[in-house]
Design a protein with these regions (language model features):
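Short amphipathic alpha-helix that is part of the acyltransferase structural core
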Residues: 1-37
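Conserved acetyl-CoA-binding loop-helix of GNAT-fold acetyltransferases
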Residues: 91-110, 133
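Conserved catalytic-core motifs of GNAT/GCN5-like acyltransferases
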Residues: 137-150
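Conserved beta-strand-loop-alpha-helix junction that forms the acyl-donor binding cleft
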Residues: 118-129, 144-145
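Short, aromatic/basic amphipathic alpha-helical patches
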Residues: 129-137
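Conserved acyl-donor/pantetheine-binding loop and adjacent beta-alpha core of acyl/acetyltransferases
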Residues: 54-85
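A short helix-loop-beta-strand connector motif used in the catalytic cores of GNAT acetyltransferases and
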Residues: 30-58, 63-66
Length: 151
């Protein structure tokens, strides 16, 4: 199924389970034109129950900021701008984390004048391998995070 943009209520529900940035306030994550939550839905049919179920394959939280944050405090305090910051991404099925990043970038390129797509990623080996294997460049190593840039 195609990339979807979550409204406030759905974003709050989805982000309750954010494994990357669980401390960020739910109400902060969505604001018109500059803070968005995208997701990839997955629909399947259960033969035993004779009905369809919908789940979420992947989630990507984006803030369009005026600076590149290196901490959650900066993420929360920077203003609206033209840098798309991917600050939380997670998936429930293999390959869907990569898919949501590229689908979201394609969508944003058509909707915004933003020309930079940067992450604020946890400083983990898993995040490092994920972003580098998907073509991002390590932009900056910080004390608590790493910033990667996608072109």
């Amino acid at each position: 199924m195609a990339l979807q943009k979550a409204g406030v209520d759905l974003a709050n529900e989805i982000c309750k389970n954010d494994p990357v940035r669980p401390n960020l306030p739910l109400g902060w994550r969505v604001a018109p034109c500059w803070k968005e939550v995208f997701y990839l839905p997955f629909t399947y049919f259960s033969v035993s129950e004779d009905r369809y179920h919908e789940s979420i394959d992947a989630v990507l939280c984006v803030a369009h900021l005026n600076e590149i944050p290196i901490s959650e405090d900066e993420l929360l305090s920077f203003g609206h701008g033209n840098i798309s910051v991917f600050y939380s991404v997670w998936s429930n099925r293999k390959g869907q984390g990569r898919q949501i990043i590229f689908d979201t970038m394609d969508l944003l390129k058509g909707q915004h004048s933003n020309n930079r797509y940067v992450t604020m990623s946890p400083k983990t080996e898993m995040a490092m391998k994920f972003h580098l294997s998907n073509g991002a460049v390590l932009l900056r190593e910080n004390e608590e995070t790493n910033n990667f840039e996608y072109k």
